[in-house]
Amino acid sequence: MYVLRMPRPREFEPEAVLNQAMLRFWERGYRATSIEDLVKATGVKPGSIYSAFPGGKRALFLKSLERYSKLVVPQKLGELEAPSASLAELRGYFDGLVRDLLSPEGRQGCLLVNTAIENAAGDDEAAAVVRGHLARLERCMATALRNARSQGEVRASVDPEGGAKLLVATCQGLMVVGKANPDEAVLRAIADNAFAVLA
C-alpha cells in the first residue's frame, strides 16, 4: 500500500528569517557571517534554512540584498524619489546620510555599498543588485538636479546626468569615510564641496 507522505509544515516564517538574516549580513558582511551565525540570528536549524533557501548562505544573502532594496532603500531615499524632488530633497538626503553615519547603528553603513566593497567583483549576481541600486539612486538625483536647474537652484550649465554621477560617487565615498572617521565636520565638508561644484 502506497503511503502519501505529506511535507512537514514549516515552523518558521521565511519573511522573518530573511529580515534577521539581512540584519546579520548588514552588520557583519557576507564573509564574516557563517551558517552558525545565521542559525543563531534566526533561530532556524541549518537544514530548514537550506530547505527554504536552496543554495544556503549565498542564496539567503542574495535574497537579503533584494529585501534591503525593497524595505530599507525607500526609507533612506525618502522624498528624493518623488518626481518633484529638487535641491532641498538632495540636501535632505545628504543630511540624513551624515546623521546616519554619526549614529552607532549608522556606522555599519549601507548593505549594498558594503557588498560592492567586499565581494561584488567576484559575484555577478550580487554585483547586479548593487548596480541596480546605484542606477536607482542616480536616476533620483538626476531628476532632482533637472528640477533644480529649471528652478534656478543650480547653474544653468549643470548637466543633470553628470552631476548625478558626481553625487552618487560622493555618497559612496561618504559611507566609506564615515565608517573609518565619523567626524561630522569632515563628512559635511565632503557633501558641501560636492554641492559647491553645482552651485
Regions found by a protein language model. Give the residues of each.
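C-terminal peripheral helix-coil segments that are non-catalytic and often amphipathic
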Residues: M1-R5, D95-R99, A135-Q151, E161, ...
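Helix-turn-helix
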Residues: R5, A16, Q20-K63
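Amphipathic alpha-helical segments used for helix-helix packing
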Residues: E89-L90, P104-E125
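Short, solvent-exposed amphipathic helices
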Residues: G78, E125-R136, C140-T143
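Hydrophobic alpha-helical connector segments
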Residues: K76-Q108, P160-L167
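Short, basic, alpha-helical segments at the C-terminal edge of helix-turn-helix-like DNA-binding modules
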Residues: E66-L71
